[in-house]
Every structure is written in structure tokens, then in C-alpha cells.
Amino acid sequence: MTALPARGEVWWCEMAEIGRRPVVVLSRDAAIPRLRRALVAPCTTTIRGLASEVVLEPGSDPIPRRSAVNLDSVESVSVAVLVNRLGRLADIRMRAICTALEVAVDCSR
């Protein structure tokens, strides 16, 4: 990784436990350089149709295959495992991700 990730970006993440997969950066930009960590949501090609998922499409989103952002599986990772930036999601897509995260952590009450 040469540059720090930013909120709303999609990066390839390489971890021994999960291998290589795209993730969406959820952390606020101010926290990333101080903590050297980022809260990320993994992308999966298994689309379950849950309210806690957001489907991304190649062509309109910076993702190689049709995938779902899984907001039930967010985790904090070292920026060192974020190895290649794929691009940035549109604001409308990030709003959908925030709504799905609210569902995943049951904060809508």
C-alpha cells in the first residue's frame, strides 16, 4: 500500500484468514492516519438479499464482479493489508451502505 485508504473507497484486502477480497472502507478519514487501521466491510459474490447488504455492479461500481457489501461482517484491519485501491463509490452508494450498516447493528430505533 502506498497511500492511505479513504472512506468510501474499495480496496483489495489480503489477509491469511480470508485470502484476497475487495472491501469497502467505512472509517472516517480523520481516524485512519492516526490509528493506522480502518473499519472495512467485505464484498462477497454470495448475495443473500439481506437488508444489511448493498449490491455493487461492475461498470457502475469499482468492483470486478457483481458483489454484495456484507455489513454484518465489518472488521477493523491494519492499513498494511489494504494492498490496491480499486476506486471510490458514489455518494448514493455510500448512503445505501450507511443505511445497511444501521440495519446490521440495529441502530434504527
From Swiss-Prot:
GO biological process, alphabetically ordered: mRNA catabolic process; negative regulation of growth; rRNA catabolic process
A Pfam family reported for this protein in Swiss-Prot or TrEMBL: PemK_toxin
Keyword list, A-Z: Endonuclease, Hydrolase, Nuclease, Toxin-antitoxin system
Nuclease is among the record's keywords: yes
InterPro entries recorded: PemK-like (IPR003477), Plasmid_toxin/cell-grow_inhib (IPR011067)
Class in the EC hierarchy, top level: hydrolase
EC code(s) of this entry: 3.1.-.-
Induction: Repressed by Mce3R.
A molecular function (GO) term: RNA endonuclease activity
Subunit architecture: Forms a complex with cognate antitoxin MazE5.
Similarity remark: Belongs to the PemK/MazF family.
Protein purpose: Toxic component of a type II toxin-antitoxin (TA) system. Upon expression in M.smegmatis inhibits colony formation. Its toxic effect is neutralized by coexpression with cognate antitoxin MazE5. Probably an endoribonuclease.
Protein's recorded name: Probable endoribonuclease MazF5
